[in-house]
């Protein structure tokens, strides 16, 4: 009986995690699309440089200041640096 209740609880938690993962993927798709738009705008107006480390640092610091989760700031930095890098490299390849 207890095992069945545990499985049901785990199943509900996993469904919620899956929904969050779906939302995160959708937001990543939106983000990369906007980065592509920004890079195209820069290319068309010669407003370089395309990569701005100061902007990346600003984004990461802002997100770290908003962090209220158990995730440590260095993990927030790593996650978002990876996201920023993936979006930028995708935009640059197009």
Kindly give the residue locations of the regions a language model identified.
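Domain-level signature for soluble enzymes in the chorismate/prephenate branch of the shikimate pathway
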Residues: 1-94
